[in-house]
Amino acid sequence: MTELDYQGTAEAASTSYSRNQTDLKPFPSAGSASSSIKTTEPVKDHRRRRSSSIISHVEPETFEDENDQQLLPNMNATWVDQRGAWIIHVVIIILLKLFYNLFPGVTTEWSWTLTNMTYVIGSYVMFHLIKGTPFDFNGGAYDNLTMWEQIDDETLYTPSRKFLISVPIALFLVSTHYAHYDLKLFSWNCFLTTFGAVVPKLPVTHRLRISIPGITGRAQIS
């Protein structure tokens, strides 16, 4: 093969390679990927409230969040069903009553009223105000639920839930009896027990959020 033939063959091969390159579809480059990312809408948290109004409702979890919730037992709520968990409520009430009896000048009527008030406020903060769990074992699947909503996997009318509803009602009746049915103390105990211990536990308020501007913040979302 002469030198001219070799050069001609090389030029033909180069021309064929250039044509093949122009016919190929370009592979997605970094620039095209970045442009597609820019046009993609941001992912919204499905657990955000449905509206920005004062009263809102927490939406159900996705399939992935439900799997995270069922991965391990929820230690933040399973203790409610343990042996002795019910007795501790009675012990706390007795200790509160003995504590307020130590204050001089506090009558029996007011000691029972203060006991009822302390128990109701404490249980409201514990079961209905604080959200999430102190344990990091489920990828934040419970971060938007209160302890009351976590108990028994949100199953209503379980024995534990019925007990937790009946305790403040029984304490209210005892406080009213030992307050000798004083109208002012009765009204105060009735209002506090109804809206602090009974209504938040009803099915109608399940996953319900009430946001008061300047007082309560947004629901916790991880």
From Swiss-Prot:
Record's subcellular location: Endoplasmic reticulum membrane
Transmembrane segment boundaries: 86-106, 110-130, 163-183, 185-205
Membrane topology qualifier: Multi-pass membrane protein
Pfam families: ORMDL
InterPro entries associated with the record: ORMDL
Cellular component, GO annotation: endoplasmic reticulum; endoplasmic reticulum membrane; serine palmitoyltransferase complex
Biological process terms in GO annotation: ceramide metabolic process; intracellular sphingolipid homeostasis; negative regulation of sphingolipid biosynthetic process; response to unfolded protein; sphingolipid biosynthetic process
PTM annotation (Phosphoserine): residues: S29, S32, S56
Residues exposed to the Cytoplasmic side: 1-85, 131-162, 206-222
UniProt keyword annotation of Endoplasmic reticulum present: yes
Keywords: Endocytosis, Endoplasmic reticulum, Lipid metabolism, Membrane, Phosphoprotein, Sphingolipid metabolism, Transmembrane, Transmembrane helix
Region span, Disordered: 1-57
Reported modifications of this chain: Phosphorylated in case of disruption of sphingolipid synthesis. Phosphorylation regulates inhibitory activity of serine palmitoyltransferases (LCB1 and LCB2).
Topological domain ranges for the Extracellular compartment: 107-109, 184
Compositionally biased tracts (Polar residues): 12-23
Phenotype reported upon loss of the gene: Double knockout of ORM1 and ORM2 exhibits defect in ceramide synthesis, increasing the level of total sphingolipids and causing phytosphingosine and dihydrosphingosine to accumulate; the accumulation of phytosphingosine reduces the phosphorylation of both YPK1 and LAC1. The mutant also exhibits random distribution of actin patches between mother and daughter cells, and shows a defect in endocytosis.
Miscellaneous section: Present with 2800 molecules/cell in log phase SD medium.
Subunit structure and binding partners: Component of the SPOTS complex, at least composed of LCB1/2 (LCB1 and/or LCB2), ORM1/2 (ORM1 and/or ORM2), SAC1 and TSC3.
Entry function: Component of the SPOTS complex that acts as a negative regulator of sphingolipid synthesis. Acts by inhibiting serine palmitoyltransferases (LCB1 and LCB2) activity. Along with ORM2, plays a role in the phosphorylation of LAC1 and YPK1, the distribution of actin patches between mother and daughter cells, and in endocytosis. Disruption or inhibition of sphingolipid synthesis leads to the activation and phosphorylation of YPK1 through the TORC2 and PKH1 pathways, which in turn phosphorylates ORM1 and LAG1 to activate sphingolipid synthesis.
Family that this chain belongs to: Belongs to the ORM family.
Identification of the protein by name: Protein ORM1
